[in-house]
Amino acid sequence: AMLPQRSQVASEDYPLSRRLYFYLPANAKPQARALAEFAQSPAGQAIVAQLGFVSQQVKAQPVPPQADMPPRYRTLAKHAQRLSVNFRFQEGSASLDNKALRDVQRVAEYLRQAGKLQSKAVLVGFGDPKETPGRAALLSRLRALAVRRELARDGVDVLEVTGMGDELPVAGNDQEQGRLRNRRVEVWVY
């Protein structure tokens, strides 16, 4: 059993976390657009946090090293902190999903404010099992490289990109929904 922790809900690692969507028609009124933009802005997310809900504000948090972690991941846990954001992808693709595109801006701004734009971030990609050995590791690395490319557009110079393949799943792989949750990229900072 996994207890709900804010960091796991924010990163969507907690199994019961769900996204809240704002749908606007193409000809939306300016007030509706303004509300949707404000809700996703730093000021709007500050209100979300103030009211006791889990916001999309990026935070760095330590992760206790565990003996069963892969060696590279355990080293990160010992020396770096994990950001409260996971990048996820469109189904069957290495293209970032709509939330991840906004998260690129949030992460870049967090790193800018923390003075960590240059060679302080590590991207760790994960995936679901594949029949061909090494394919999961390759695909997870390609996803992490896609995130690096987007972060670079916002001035972030990533220190390292790695793919962990199907290690450390956050959901079961027996259904497509679980496999989608496992296809993620974490951000760690020194």
Q: What residue ranges belong to the model's regions?
A:
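Exported/periplasmic ABC-transporter solute-binding proteins
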Residues: 1-102, 106-118, 124, 145, ...
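Periplasmic OmpA-like peptidoglycan-binding domain that tethers envelope proteins to the cell wall
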Residues: 112, 116-117, 126-190
